[in-house]
């Protein structure tokens, strides 16, 4: 009986000690996740934007081979570059908000569930010890 009652406080302290590092790893994980979001969004947007100008340049180059070709590439790249910079400025802000908010909610729900489970386990453990004793 004594050994069983002594094991309960140890599990309780382990739960507390585990909850603190989890919070640290969660914040670190959020930072790395937001960075990966930025990179993935930038990569997907840059690929899609690089494909669209290439498809536009080929027909313009084929149709306007009489000398307009030199004018069209000179006038078209500056606005395209400007659009890319605008996307790169806006894209990191959006995913961080979307990525972090749901994660925070999920983490909070997970922590509440673990606390409830710990209480249930302790209650079941107490009832088992009472019935056996």
Curated annotation (Swiss-Prot):
Zn(2+) binds at residues 12, 16, 24, 26. The keyword Aminoacyl-tRNA synthetase does not apply. One of its GO terms (cellular component) is nucleolus. The modification Phosphoserine is found at residue 132. Keywords: Chromosome, Developmental protein, Differentiation, DNA-binding, Metal-binding, Nucleosome core, Nucleus, Phosphoprotein, Spermatogenesis, Zinc. Residues 1-133 are annotated as: Disordered. GO terms for molecular function: DNA binding; zinc ion binding. A motif (Nuclear localization signal) lies at residues 110-118. PANTHER family: NUCLEAR TRANSITION PROTEIN 2. This is Nuclear transition protein 2. It comes from Pan paniscus (Pygmy chimpanzee). The lineage of its organism: Eukaryota, Metazoa, Chordata, Craniata, Vertebrata. The gene is TNP2.
């Amino acid at each position: 009986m004594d050994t069983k009652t002594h094991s309960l406080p140890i599990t309780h302290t382990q739960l507390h000690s585990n909850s603190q590092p989890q919070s640290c790893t969660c914040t670190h994980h959020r930072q790395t996740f937001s960075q990966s979001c930025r990179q993935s969004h930038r990569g997907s947007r840059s690929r899609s934007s690089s494909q669209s100008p290439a498809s536009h340049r080929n027909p313009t180059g084929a149709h306007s081979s009489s000398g307009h070709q030199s004018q069209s590439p000179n006038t078209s790249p500056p606005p395209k570059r400007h659009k890319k910079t605008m996307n790169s400025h806006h894209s990191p802000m959006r995913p961080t908000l979307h990525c972090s908010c749901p994660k925070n909610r999920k983490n909070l729900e997970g922590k509440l569930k673990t606390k409830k489970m710990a209480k249930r386990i302790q209650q079941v453990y107490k009832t088992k010890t009472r019935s056996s004793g």
